[in-house]
Curated annotation (Swiss-Prot):
Gene: csrA
Residue stretches in coiled coil: none
Annotated keywords: Bacterial flagellum biogenesis, Cytoplasm, Repressor, RNA-binding, Translation regulation
Identification of the protein by name: Translational regulator CsrA
Membrane-spanning residues: none
Description of how the protein assembles with itself and partners: Homodimer; the beta-strands of each monomer intercalate to form a hydrophobic core, while the alpha-helices form wings that extend away from the core.
The organism of origin for this protein: Bacillus pumilus (strain SAFR-032)
Amino acid sequence: MLVLSRKLNQSIQIGDDIEVKIISIEGDQVKIGIEAPKHIDIHRKEVYLSIQEENNRAASLSVDLLSQLSSQKK
């Protein structure tokens, strides 16, 4: 993992298209701004993990449903 230090209003450039900027620092909370192309999804980690979990559940349910439908046609 790369660890970088930044101060207020400083930024980090990721590739040609993504900039992460420190917007404010209040106590133990840091607000960041992210400029990236529209086609790049950006989520908080806990939201991303929740989306992945839901997608896995949906995929599993689809396989189970297909199995049930397949056995009903026989």
